[in-house]
């Protein structure tokens, strides 16, 4: 009996040579590290070294998160990934009324350069690669990181890492936007230009499908809407006067890995192929690095369950295997208790150990793209590609990613997909172990990590002290220069850096830009 994939595509019970009738491996595959990059972006992939193990972490105060980062480094992590709390993500200071009850909850609270200095204290920034999951205020956190590097004596051209900086997906799936799309895209173009000359090894954006998938997007929707956002960013940069080959090599992507390994592997391969073709044919990119879809993967948090949470260890191992077989460049494996609370030290260590077992105790790193030529994988790759391209065409027909957002297209498609999954789970058609089958009569008690509510008062005290200690006229002058740049066409990152160096807060900098650019009001198109 034919089954349906997560994207609603048929999965046949048996595949054979006839499944690939007329299929041209030279056209569809190529060699690893060569166009169209179906088999991976590098010739040797993991045969020389494994993917980067980058565990997402951050909670409470900068000092608490700093201790967690040092522990992760001691346990063998290869890169840091910073989680920020909601006030920081929304451009509010910890003592703002809108921040009440959220300070330090889902990530670390960063209000100023003072906090950033503590966050990376004792961590040499020329020895570690850092990813920061921050979007609307991404420029601020990047500049504070650069300032901390300067204090450590690290030249900016030695800083490596990534800022997420993908605001379009915030309008679609997540909601941590600040400014309307037009100034948001202008800010992203300013970041591209700034990093090209100032921080050349920095990945300036991580175009993200993960959050759409967590909101309910199917694999085909995930890559279609993510690549459509990527096209919008490339068009914005080109319209701002940049040559595509000057910035495209620093673009990166971020996807989810579900437990459905076959379709996930097909999804990753299809995404690489589509992006390479778009960059070559639509934008005329000539640098091979401009054609490469490099991506980070995080295992699917939405598939983790609060019931029998230890079973999540198994889910995460399966998800991580799919990401590796699909050719990810870096990977975060979720902790088993994340459906309940922030990870404990033990659960975070087990999540990292899961990757280490995959890398060092299996043979998946022995050969490049082990599924190449598989009847089922190649057929599913073609099917996912066709479904994604169809969705991308529909986005283009609505005026591109921004036009489709204004019509509510992506959000509507994702909500329909999420509703289907919820219906199937409620009916029992979709089995979730421990939730609608194989339940326990009584759940075993589990003590989660709890964030101290006193953190909010501590951050407020730090802010009050900062405001009395700093040179207020210097802050005011820097914020005035920032607003002038925002009103005109000058790159806003230079005056923004001056303001942050003078100890202006995240809230103050974002409020200065709010005065000029306004704030985004969501569409009620559907």
Region locations from a protein language model:
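Phosphate/diphosphate-binding loops
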Residues: 111, 129, 134-137, 149-151, ...
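Catalytic alpha/beta active-site cores
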Residues: 1-258, 263-264, 282, 289-296, ...
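Poly-acidic low-complexity segments
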Residues: 76, 124, 155, 166, ...
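Flexible, glycine-rich loop/tail regions that form catalytic "lids" or insertion modules at the edges
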Residues: 3-22, 31-37, 86, 338, ...
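Flexible glycine/proline-rich, aromatic-decorated loop/lid segments
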Residues: 243-247, 285-299, 307-336, 343-368, ...
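Extended, hydrophobic alpha-helical segments in both membrane/secreted and soluble proteins
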Residues: 141, 230, 253-279, 295-310, ...
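Short beta-alpha connecting loops at secondary-structure transitions
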Residues: 101-105, 169-179, 212-217, 255-260, ...
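Generic secondary-structure signature for well-ordered alpha-helical cores
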Residues: 78, 121-125, 150-155, 189-201, ...
């Amino acid at each position: 009996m034919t089954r349906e994939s997560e994207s609603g595509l048929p999965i046949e019970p048996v595949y054979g040579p006839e499944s690939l009738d007329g299929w041209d491996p030279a056209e569809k595959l190529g060699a690893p590290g060569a166009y169209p990059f179906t088999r991976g972006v590098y010739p040797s992939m993991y045969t020389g070294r494994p993917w980067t193990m980058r565990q997402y972490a951050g909670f409470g105060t900068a000092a608490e998160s700093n201790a967690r980062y040092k522990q992760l480094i001691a346990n063998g992590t290869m890169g840091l990934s910073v989680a920020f709390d909601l006030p920081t993500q929304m451009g509010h200071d910890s003592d703002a009324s809108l921040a009440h009850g959220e300070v330090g909850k889902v990530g670390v609270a960063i209000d100023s350069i003072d906090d950033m200095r503590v966050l990376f204290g004792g961590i040499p920034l020329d020895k570690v690669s850092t990813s920061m999951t921050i979007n609307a205020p991404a420029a601020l956190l990047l500049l504070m990181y650069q300032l901390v590097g300067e204090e450590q004596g690290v030249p900016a051209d030695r800083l490596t890492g990534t800022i997420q900086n993908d605001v379009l997906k915030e309008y679609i799936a997540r909601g941590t936007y600040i400014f309307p799309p037009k100034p948001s895209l202008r800010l992203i173009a300013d970041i591209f230009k700034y990093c090209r000359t100032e921080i050349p090894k920095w990945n300036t954006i991580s175009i993200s499908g993960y959050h759409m998938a967590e909101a309910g997007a199917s694999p085909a929707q995930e890559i279609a809407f993510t690549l459509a956002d990527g096209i919008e960013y490339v068009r914005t940069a080109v319209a701002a006067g940049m040559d595509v080959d000057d910035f495209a090599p620093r673009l990166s992507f971020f996807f989810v890995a579900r437990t459905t390994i076959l379709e996930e592997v097909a999804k990753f391969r299809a995404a690489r192929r589509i992006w390479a073709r778009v960059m070559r044919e639509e934008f005329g990119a000539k640098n091979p690095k401009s054609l490469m879809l490099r991506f980070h993967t995080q295992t699917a948090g939405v598939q983790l369950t609060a019931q029998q949470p230890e079973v999540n260890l198994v889910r995460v191992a399966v998800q991580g295997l799919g990401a590796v077989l699909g050719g990810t460049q870096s990977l975060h494996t979720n902790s088993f208790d994340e459906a309940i609370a922030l990870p404990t030290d033990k659960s975070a260590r087990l999540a990292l150990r899961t990757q280490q077992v995959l890398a060092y105790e299996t043979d998946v790193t022995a050969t490049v793209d082990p599924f190449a030529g598989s009847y089922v994988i190649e057929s599913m790759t073609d099917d996912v590609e066709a479904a994604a391209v169809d969705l991308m065409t529909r986005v283009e027909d609505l005026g591109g990613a921004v036009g489709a957002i204004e019509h509510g297209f992506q959000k509507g498609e994702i909500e329909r997909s999420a509703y289907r999954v919820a219906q199937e789970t409620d009916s029992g058609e979709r089995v979730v172990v421990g939730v609608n089958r194989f339940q326990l009569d009584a759940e075993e008690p589990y003590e989660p990590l709890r964030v101290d509510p006193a953190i909010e008062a501590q951050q407020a005290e730090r802010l009050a002290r900062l405001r009395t200690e700093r040179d207020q006229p210097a802050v005011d002058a820097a914020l005035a220069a920032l607003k002038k740049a925002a009103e005109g066409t000058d790159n806003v990152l230079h005056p923004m850096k001056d303001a942050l160096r003078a100890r202006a807060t995240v809230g103050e900098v974002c409020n200065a830009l709010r005065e000029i650019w306004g704030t985004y009001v969501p569409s009620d198109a559907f």
